[in-house]
Amino acid sequence: MDARWWAVVVLAAFPSLGAGGETPEAPPESWTQLWFFRFVVNAAGYASFMVPGYLLVQYFRRKNYLETGRGLCFPLVKACVFGNEPKASDEVPLAPRTEAAETTPMWQALKLLFCATGLQVSYLTWGVLQERVMTRSYGATATSPGERFTDSQFLVLMNRVLALIVAGLSCVLCKQPRHGAPMYRYSFASLSNVLSSWCQYEALKFVSFPTQVLAKASKVIPVMLMGKLVSRRSYEHWEYLTATLISIGVSMFLLSSGPEPRSSPATTLSGLILLAGYIAFDSFTSNWQDALFAYKMSSVQMMFGVNFFSCLFTVGSLLEQGALLEGTRFMGRHSEFAAHALLLSICSACGQLFIFYTIGQFGAAVFTIIMTLRQAFAILLSCLLYGHTVTVVGGLGVAVVFAALLLRVYARGRLKQRGKKAVPVESPVQKV
């Protein structure tokens, strides 16, 4: 059935949702008003790969292919379905974070400045470009309003392709431990990661960027819930306290902020639902990646595996919808968009490398502080560049959120000093 007829059916079932914030109003027939419909179509495209793949995995396992299989396909099936048991001689232990005796305090300070600058520049640029791409028009003139880029899935694909290339080159050029995880297990983290990224980009059509940043900061709560369900973790009292403070701060910001121009209760609700979807999918991704690290792979190998399936899912879904060519044509019509999308992908991939290097050199606590400050700077930068307003109560709510995040870092450090096992920091393998 033609996509326009599907649009008519869904419009009859759901109220029309206009683009929120400062974005131009979309025409009635535009699918940007039907985010739920696009989500279902995308998910169906991913299922067309996941379901046959799952059935094949179950078939090979029931057939005991590891014992009976032979031929040219055996190594491929073994790697994808069963994995490889790492041998002691094959393991390449990742170097622990140690401070060399000859390293001077000045050199350490310069390295910290390099890491902090790299993270801030990468992710602040990424945030500014993300808001520009999803909320502004391209090709606008005095007589024409231009056109907006609306396909969030195409943007996810561009990010993942460059990240896959960077991870692949890192695996080839740098010595890695022998890979032991079955490849199919990456597909679950990849699916949730693609869906979380899609929700993140799509939400910017309905809510402001500062609201999105605070929503990301509040994902500590669903991460803890997912940790209980997926990893059976237990948490300290201070973690529940800081999670409550974050909830209070976010509530202060959301309840005190006035509506953006052209927004409505329907668009705001759509944005909040998409942000909730982002947080839920991202929380699952983090906990699934933590479980996968039991196979002793490196962070770069994890990055490669997740992005490989992300590219497979998004390319397949875009081809099924006929949207891959349209996204490419949009890039051809608007060179500015092509430059923005490329720079967005570069910032994402470089940010990943800075994450790995910073944690390796200074630990997760320093990394968390840098990224917390980055979120605060991102809100300030967005308000300056795109004219978002924040009330006094909203500003206090933002302060409460970031104070709670820094309190979590301090509490983790105290636990480490006392020799207690601190709750691991959220997996940083895929941030965007």
Swiss-Prot record:
Location of this chain's protein in the cell: Golgi apparatus membrane
Principal location listed in the UniProt entry: Golgi
Tissue-level expression: Highly expressed in the placenta, pancreas, mammary gland and skeletal muscle. Weakly or not expressed in colon, heart and prostate. Expressed in the brain, predominantly in frontal lobe gray matter, subcortical frontal white matter and cerebellum.
Example GO BP: positive regulation of canonical NF-kappaB signal transduction
Gene Ontology cellular-component terms listed: endoplasmic reticulum membrane; Golgi apparatus; Golgi membrane; membrane; trans-Golgi network
Residues bearing the modification Phosphoserine: 427
Keywords carried by this UniProt record: Antiport, Golgi apparatus, Leukodystrophy, Membrane, Phosphoprotein, Transmembrane, Transmembrane helix, Transport
Pfam hit, one: UAA
Alphabetized GO MF terms: 3'-phosphoadenosine 5'-phosphosulfate transmembrane transporter activity; antiporter activity
Keyword Membrane: yes
Top-level division of the source organism's lineage: Eukaryota
Mode of membrane association: Multi-pass membrane protein
Stretches that traverse the bilayer: 5-25, 40-60, 109-129, 154-174, 238-258, 265-285, 299-319, 353-373, 387-407
Reaction catalysis annotation: 3'-phosphoadenylyl sulfate(in) + adenosine 3',5'-bisphosphate(out) = 3'-phosphoadenylyl sulfate(out) + adenosine 3',5'-bisphosphate(in)
Family: Belongs to the nucleotide-sugar transporter family. SLC35B subfamily.
Disease with which this protein is associated in UniProt: Leukodystrophy, hypomyelinating, 26, with chondrodysplasia: A form of hypomyelinating leukodystrophy, a group of heterogeneous disorders characterized by persistent deficit of myelin observed on brain imaging. HLD26 is an autosomal recessive form characterized by severe psychomotor delay, limited or absent speech, abnormal development of brain white matter, corpus callosum hypoplasia, and cerebral atrophy. Other features include pre- and postnatal growth retardation, chondrodysplasia, and early-onset scoliosis.
Entry function: Probably functions as a 3'-phosphoadenylyl sulfate:adenosine 3',5'-bisphosphate antiporter at the Golgi membranes. Mediates the transport from the cytosol into the lumen of the Golgi of 3'-phosphoadenylyl sulfate/adenosine 3'-phospho 5'-phosphosulfate (PAPS), a universal sulfuryl donor for sulfation events that take place in that compartment.
Record-given protein name: Adenosine 3'-phospho 5'-phosphosulfate transporter 1
Gene: SLC35B2
